Curated annotation (Swiss-Prot):
Range of residues in the leader sequence: 1-18
Molecular functions (GO terms): serine-type endopeptidase activity; toxin activity
Species of origin: Trimeresurus stejnegeri (Chinese green tree viper)
Tissue expression summary: Expressed by the venom gland.
Propeptide: 19-24
Function: Snake venom serine protease homolog that may act in the hemostasis system of the prey.
Glycosylated position list: N83, N123, N124
GO CC list: extracellular region; secretory granule
Entries under InterPro entries matching the protein: Peptidase_S1_PA (IPR009003), Peptidase_S1_PA_chymotrypsin (IPR043504), Peptidase_S1A (IPR001314), Trypsin_dom (IPR001254), TRYPSIN_SER (IPR033116)
Compartmental location: Secreted
Domain of life, per lineage: Eukaryota
An example Gene Ontology biological process: proteolysis
The name this protein goes by in its record: Snake venom serine protease homolog KN7
Length: 260
């Protein structure tokens, strides 16, 4: 009888733990420490709190969202846990920042892209390495990966110590047009998410990567509030459409403009 009571109590504890664990995330889990070597965190010198993500695309350049620009910005590379510092964690400051049309002018749904040149290049290491730019645009239905230190609660600002990752799908742009009023008929953005909801990027993930088949296809831009609602997928700046601009800037053509 005592054994039965003990087993029953253990079962209750296990169920309670499972319920609490499921409530801690917006459809994702802690990223594997080796899967995000290109993921960077943006913060300001004063706040010390990550406000955005970014993507290392070579040893000297980081891709992020225009909405993530701040004064006195800092870029943290090689980070996993905010409580345990990896030996190869590095911090950089921008040497130059570039925006579409040579200015930080973007609408809520367009031209949300920023290219940061680091003041000092970084070297590849155990936890730092760039990711490839896209060779082709992503196909509909493709499963892609999002990641970041953004909030893990849809109702309150609860930021994790480690980056969280989730798989989402590339959706037809018409799905996002149906979800959000005033979206233009065409846009250089990707629509991605889970129609049933429950998996989504959220506050603090902006600027981070949408990774598809080992290439950065999107930049986290914006989405529904609260995060993770059914039929409210996220909008991601389409990197493929900005390839010529990105490559021109990196090659030294500072007057390059984004596609219309």
């Amino acid at each position: 009888m005592v054994l039965i009571r003990v087993l029953a109590n253990l079962l209750i504890l296990q169920l309670s733990y499972a319920q609490k664990s499921s409530e801690l995330i917006i459809g994702g889990d802690e990223c594997n420490i080796n899967e995000h070597r290109f993921l960077v965190a943006l913060y300001t010198f004063r706040s010390r709190r990550f406000h955005c993500g970014g993507t290392l695309i070579n040893q000297e350049w980081v891709l992020s969202a225009a909405r993530c620009d701040r004064k006195n910005i800092r870029i943290k590379l090689g980070m996993h846990s905010t409580n345990v510092t990896n030996e190869d964690v590095q911090t950089r400051v921008p040497k130059e920042k570039f925006f579409c049309l040579s200015s930080k002018t973007y609408t809520k749904w367009n031209k949300d892209i920023m290219l940061i040149r680091l003041k000092r290049p970084v070297n590849n290491s155990t936890h730092i390495a760039p990711v490839s730019l896209p060779s082709n645009p992503p196909s509909l239905g493709l499963v892609c990966r999002v990641m970041g230190w953004g909030t893990i609660s849809a109702t309150k600002e609860t930021h994790p110590d480690v980056p969280h990752c989730a798989n989402i799908n590339i959706l037809d742009y018409s799905v996002c047009r149906a979800a959000y009023a005033r979206l233009p008929a065409t846009s250089r953005t990707l629509c991605a998410g889970i129609l049933e909801g429950g998996k989504d990027t959220c506050h603090g993930d902006s600027g981070g990567p949408l990774i598809c088949n080992g290439q950065v296809q999107g930049i986290v831009s914006w989405g529904g509030h609260p995060c993770g609602q059914p039929r409210k997928p996220g909008l991601y700046t389409k990197v493929f459409d900005h390839l010529d601009w990105i490559k021109s800037i990196i090659a030294g053509n500072k007057d390059a403009t984004c596609p219309p």
